[in-house]
Amino acid sequence: MPLLFLWFFLTSTSLVSALQTLPCINTTYFIPNSTYDTNRRVILSLLPSNVTSHFGFFNGSIGQAPNRVYAVGMCLPGTEEESCIGCLLSASNTLLETCLTEENALIWIANRTICMIRYSDTSFVGSFELEPHREFLSIHGYKTNETEFNTVWSRLTQRMVQEASSSTDATWSGAKYYTADVAALPDSQTLYAMMQCTPDLSPAECNLCLTESVVNYQSCCLGRQGGSIVRLSCAFRAELYPFGGAFTVMTARPLSQPPPSLIKKDSGKFSTETIAAIVVPIIVVAIIFLVLLVLSRLFARRRKSYQEIDLDQSGITTLHFQQLDFKTIEVATENFAKTNKLGQGGFGEVYKGTLVNGTEVAVKRLSKTSEQGAQEFKNEVVLVAKLQHRNLVKLLGYCLEPEEKILVYEFVPNKSLDYFLFDPTKQGQLDWTKRYNIIGGITRGILYLHQDSRLTIIHRDLKASNILLDADMIPKIADFGMARISGIDQSVANTKRIAGTFGYMPPEYVIHGQFSMKSDVYSFGVLILEIICGKKNRSFYQADTKAENLVTYVWRLWTNGSPLELVDLTISENCQTEEVIRCIHIALLCVQEDPKDRPNLSTIMMMLTNSSLILSVPQPPGFFVPQNKERDSFLSSQFTMGCTSQTKNDVTITNLDPR
């Protein structure tokens, strides 16, 4: 059985103080500063960004049992990103300040916006419990005609229960099971009300949860200024004043037909009308489900190339994903015209295309080196298509012919990060704020690939040219999952086929073919340094830098106490020096020689978002090249390998045979 929690709706800072003991459940406890405590702090710090990038609702976990922490975050639909993040940060801080040793807690916060956070040592997503519930009522009473008020009340709440339990918008999971409404009362008063269920409920469960909450409200709070009923899976609140931003553009709608009574006639029993209100929607939903099931099977037979993929963490219920024929791809790319070529990487060439419906896409024509069978290729493509995150490029479809394997991605208009970062005429468009936000976005994307997605994906070729920028300069990681799609085994720690870019690859990968999530961490560290300095790796092979690579150059600046000499001159006068130095510090921790000394992505995220967190002292990094007499012997020992194809620095390596 899932552990039970108490919810609360808050309206002001004073209420937060008055009710601060309510979020914590005194069931099981952890030791302060323990592994569980660290995991709790990490996942709470990650919730704001993940909730906003997953359409208002996100669930995830971090750590290994018995220190694994499960958490859910939610904002109401229509909430602006900054407001959502601010609300979730406030909720997280309240939990951290209040629940000092409890392993289970849940909090609702309601002010101008409303959000919820819940964490536990036990998985709870999808559970449905009506009890316990909690009642909060306003201290002031109101004067009005009781009979007229009850009539308005019943009609309004019945309408809201029906609307909330049927509002299953598939494009935004946070828009499910939510409604806000107003009604005119006697004596020129107005009744404001709001209902919300968590998106993991069924429509029938949401209906039942809200119906019970309305009944509870009638028992506790009628005759008061207002109040709230909160329980495990839903919340209901009504007031005589607009307590949320949703009411600023809302006017009272007419309440026509009187609904069935929601009041229990006998203790412990529902009225006939209430039972009907619960059963009828269930029957209707069941009929609709059966009709849709029959239609979907008929449709699937007619178009086998069309697939619907269920997603449980992306915030999207279904993903429309197509298998396209080669002729369609040829038409879209004008027969792979050179004028449409966007670039070329280790896995193949990329072209811009336009589908017949006008959608612009990026078409990756894979090189014919994969020994993977058609079915295996198709299976891996479908799996990778399930990865949905704001900071990942969307895979929209694929083409599979006897001699062709093609991937179709969303088209990202601002090209790749290196297009701006390494061009002296364009790098000024990336001020420090944009670069810092890009670092944060890449961090969230890799964290999703490593930990929060259905699959554990090691990118293996993380570099500036694989970071695309959308119209708002939000970074989107490209080429993720290519190891799976191309048939490179990611289940083993060693490989004879190295896919990566020299300069971004860590020592253990280049020399011994060993890879892990810490390989991506090393690449990310190099990428952070490039973002700060605005130069490619190979720029540091020039004689005037007195360094053989970027990592060596930065390490010498760090040990000499002059890290800010690394900063791109175009942003050096307008950057936040403390943020820059902290990012350099984090990057040096990422490029440590021993993979065990490199932080994981959840820790990196915490380092970026929590400036008060003390960072460890970095040691000499991997591929640090000593000066003078030691250099030749060092290079000989580090880079001796046999390889069939190898290029210098930033050219992708796709087929190496390490010692």
From Swiss-Prot:
Reactions accelerated catalytically: L-seryl-[protein] + ATP = O-phospho-L-seryl-[protein] + ADP + H(+); L-threonyl-[protein] + ATP = O-phospho-L-threonyl-[protein] + ADP + H(+)
Residues listed as glycosylation sites in the UniProt record: N26, N33, N50, N59, N111, N145
GO molecular function terms attached to this record: ATP binding; protein serine kinase activity; protein serine/threonine kinase activity
Alphabetized PROSITE patterns for the sequence: GNK2 (PS51473), PROTEIN_KINASE_ATP (PS00107), PROTEIN_KINASE_DOM (PS50011), PROTEIN_KINASE_ST (PS00108)
Enzyme Commission (EC) number: 2.7.11.-
Signal peptide: 1-18
Residue span, Protein kinase domain: 336-613
Intracellular or extracellular location(s): Membrane
One CC-aspect GO term: membrane
InterPro entries per record: GNK2, GNK2_sf, Kinase-like_dom_sf, Prot_kinase_dom, Protein_kinase_ATP_BS, Ser-Thr/Tyr_kinase_cat_dom, Ser/Thr_kinase_AS
Membrane association type: Single-pass membrane protein
Residue ranges of the TM segments: 275-295
Top-rank taxon, per record: Eukaryota
Residues annotated as the enzyme's active site: D461
Gnk2-homologous domain ranges (all copies): 19-124, 131-243
Keyword vocabulary terms for this entry: ATP-binding, Glycoprotein, Kinase, Membrane, Nucleotide-binding, Receptor, Repeat, Serine/threonine-protein kinase, Signal, Transferase, Transmembrane, Transmembrane helix
Protein name per Swiss-Prot or TrEMBL: Putative cysteine-rich receptor-like protein kinase 12
Source organism of the structure: Arabidopsis thaliana
